[in-house]
């Protein structure tokens, strides 16, 4: 039930952001034509920064300090292995059958020999990891990226990639496999914290650069 509610909320927000952005675009000073909704995006960006600074970042720092590196490595590999399954499907939809087979092979090898993906054995066997999502697949169908948009909690995106994120969430292998709601919620929270911890060191270098952080993240995403 909570998963269904989240999906509806996420899609509702994308529509709201799109139409409210269209209504206010003429009132904003556009510094970048790719970001016509900059005023609204900056409000959401600042909200995300506060949530991260007050909640997510401290938890991620504690996670990195308390949990041994080999355990964190296994957690990251577990979720990335499930991502290989989704990537295989995306490659297939893009008619890229070679990479689809390679990603599927990675999933099978790591799920078995790598013990549920905890160890990335496939890379040692020469199977290259690639990452594809629904936003990229929509792009291969000729759908333009659209304006830049900052999503609450999810961060930088675009209109097309925002819908792609919603699709990815709905077909996420972990959410499909784990039926118990409490375990599913706990697993997703662990995934968020683990992912956030991987950016702690990079964030320090990023913060040391003397420029508008909003612009820096936007340009990096749209590059």
Regions found by a protein language model. Give the residues of each.
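Amphipathic, well-packed alpha-helical segments that form the structural scaffold of globular domains
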Residues: 56, 60, 64, 79, ...
């Amino acid at each position: 039930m909570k998963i269904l509610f989240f999906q509806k909320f996420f899609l509702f927000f994308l529509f709201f952001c799109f139409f409210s952005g269209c209504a206010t675009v003429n009132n904003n000073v556009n510094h970048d034509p790719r970001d016509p909704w900059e005023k609204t995006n900056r409000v959401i960006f600042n909200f995300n920064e506060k949530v991260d600074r007050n909640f997510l970042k401290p938890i991620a720092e504690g996670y990195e300090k308390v949990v041994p590196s080999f355990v964190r490595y296994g957690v990251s590999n577990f979720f990335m292995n499930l991502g290989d399954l989704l990537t295989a499907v995306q490659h297939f939809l893009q008619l890229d059958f070679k990479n689809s087979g390679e990603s599927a092979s990675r999933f099978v090898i790591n799920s078995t020999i790598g013990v549920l993906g905890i160890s990335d054995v496939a890379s040692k066997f020469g199977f290259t990891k690639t990452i594809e999502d629904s936003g990229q697949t929509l792009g291969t169908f000729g759908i333009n990226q659209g304006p830049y948009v900052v999503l609450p909690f999810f961060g930088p995106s675009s209109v097309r990639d925002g819908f792609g994120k919603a699709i990815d969430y709905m077909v996420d292998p972990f959410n499909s496999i784990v039926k118990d709601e409490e375990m599913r919620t706990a697993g997703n929270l662990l995934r968020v914290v683990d992912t956030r911890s991987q950016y702690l060191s990079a964030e320090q270098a990023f913060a040391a650069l003397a420029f508008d952080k909003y612009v820096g993240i936007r340009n990096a995403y749209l590059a």
